[in-house]
């Protein structure tokens, strides 16, 4: 008994020590001791019953207290859960993800996510705090209005809650019920007997002291088992939070990579569109030039066709004129030849006619001379003198008058021949 009292495991000394600690706060309670362990330094703001010792409530119940947010199943959601349940991602007032921009609220949510899971809800319905060993001396009770504005609604534990079932083991409860001693208020850890206790209970206290020490050991063992399980759960939760954080960082890195690739692709597409626009404008201008050139070419072809037709017509007219010229030249040459022949024939006929005329005139003159000689012979002594040059007198037919007569005669002959 004395050994147990010296170790603080139970008995009157242990009960007195716990009572003294609860009333005056002179020593550290088991919950505060667990909170101050080095391996649980992340739980510096919370006690064993999930009570926040750093909470400072004012009169303003509507103010935003992001530092008091507790880690729960809905804090620190990743994009997979948002996509699965079609939830909107968290964005700040600038329109960007608050976690990427280092928002204080998101950092607090990540810090709360790395904290261990709560055993009981943060906001109990009762006004009395569950931490009996030191919380009552340093905090004040919250009103019903403050409790109603809590972020996480209170969910009462189910009948088959594993923690409560492990803590309040049914076999142990049945064993206590089957024991000759009834379970009173003073047997519950954290609760102490009323000063108005009955005398028989005080007399029987020493008898039940050994059983109480045994129960305290069992309760302490259950506490430590729960604490160890909480520590393992916290470590698993930290690992899970670390994985979630890494996945989120990887997701944001991928998102930045995709965003950069999208920006590059968008810039490239804009450049291609500008080049396509310039190419289309150049193509349109070339098309207009092609149409104008084609129109000019069509006009040129039509003019060339007209020119070819005119040239062909001129060639035909030239050939016709050349033929006419050749024909006229041939006719002219024929006429010239004919004229030459006629001229030669005319000259020959004139010579013939002149010779005949000359002969006829000669004969006529001879006849005249013969007549004159005949008459002269009869009158040889006549006074008239015989002219021996009959061709030179005025009556001779071979004078100028005779020449004119011959010329007219020849003209008449030429006209007769031409006819």
Curated annotation (Swiss-Prot):
Q: Which residues form a coiled coil?
A: 229-355
Q: Where is this region: Disordered?
A: 34-76
UniProt keyword terms in alphabetical order: Coiled coil, Cytoplasm, Cytoskeleton, Phosphoprotein
Instruction: Describe the subunit structure.
Output: Homodimer. Interacts with KAR1, MPS2 and SPC29.
- InterPro entries with a match to the protein in the record: Bbp1_C (IPR029330), Bbp1_N (IPR029328)
Q: Which Pfam families match?
A: BBP1_C (PF15272), BBP1_N (PF15271)
What is the name attached to this protein's record?
Spindle pole component BBP1
Biased composition range(s): Low complexity:
64-75
Q: Where in the cell is it found?
A: Cytoplasm, Cytoskeleton, Microtubule organizing center, Spindle pole body
Q: GO CC terms for this protein? A: cytoplasm; spindle pole body
Q: Which family does it belong to?
A: Belongs to the BBP1 family.
Which residues lie in Basic and acidic residues bias regions? 34-48
Q: Where on the chain is Phosphoserine found, per UniProt? A: 29, 73, 115
* Functional note: Component of the spindle pole body (SPB) required for insertion of the nascent SPB into the nuclear envelope and for the proper execution of spindle pole body (SPB) duplication. Connects the central plaque of the SPB with the half-bridge. Required for proper localization of CDC5 at the SPB and for proper M-phase progression.
């Amino acid at each position: 008994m004395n050994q147990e009292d010296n170790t603080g495991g139970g008995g009157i000394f242990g009960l007195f020590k716990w009572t003294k600690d609860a009333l005056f706060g002179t020593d550290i309670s088991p919950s505060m001791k667990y909170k101050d362990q080095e391996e649980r330094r992340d739980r510096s703001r919370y006690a064993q019953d999930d009570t926040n010792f750093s909470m400072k409530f004012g009169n303003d119940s509507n103010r935003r207290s992001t530092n008091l947010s507790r880690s729960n199943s809905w804090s620190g959601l990743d994009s997979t859960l948002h996509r699965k349940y079609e939830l909107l991602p968290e964005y700040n007032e600038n329109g960007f993800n608050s976690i990427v921009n280092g928002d204080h609220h998101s950092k607090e949510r990540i810090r709360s996510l790395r904290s261990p899971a709560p055993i009981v809800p943060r906001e109990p319905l009762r006004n009395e705090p569950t931490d009996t060993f030191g919380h009552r001396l340093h905090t004040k009770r919250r009103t019903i209005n403050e409790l109603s504005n809590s972020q996480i609604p209170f969910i009462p534990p189910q009948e088959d809650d594993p923690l409560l079932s492990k803590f309040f083991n049914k076999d142990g409860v049945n064993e206590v019920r089957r024991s000759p001693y009834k379970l009173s208020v003073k047997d519950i850890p954290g609760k102490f007997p009323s000063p108005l206790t009955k005398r028989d209970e005080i007399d029987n206290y020493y008898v039940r002291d050994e059983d109480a020490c045994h129960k305290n050991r069992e309760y302490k063992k259950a506490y430590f088992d729960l604490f160890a399980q909480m520590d393992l759960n916290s470590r698993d939760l930290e690992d899970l939070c670390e994985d979630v954080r890494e996945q989120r960082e990887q997701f944001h890195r991928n998102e930045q990579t995709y965003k950069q690739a999208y920006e590059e692709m968008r810039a490239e597409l804009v450049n291609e569109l500008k080049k396509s626009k310039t190419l289309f404008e150049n193509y349109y201008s070339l098309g207009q030039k092609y149409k104008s050139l084609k129109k000019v070419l069509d006009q040129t072809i039509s003019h060339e066709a007209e020119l070819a037709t005119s040239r062909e017509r001129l060639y035909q007219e030239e050939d016709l004129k050349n033929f006419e010229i050749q024909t006229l030249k041939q006719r002219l040459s024929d006429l010239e030849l004919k004229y030459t022949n006629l001229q030669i024939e005319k000259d020959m006929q004139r010579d013939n006619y002149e010779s005949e005329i000359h002969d006829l005139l000669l004969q006529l003159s001879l006849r005249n001379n013969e007549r004159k000689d005949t008459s002269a012979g009869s009158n040889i002594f006549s006074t008239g003198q015989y002219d021996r040059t009959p061709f030179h007198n005025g009556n001779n037919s071979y004078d100028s008058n005779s020449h004119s007569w011959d010329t007219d005669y020849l003209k008449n002959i030429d006209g007769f021949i031409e006819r």
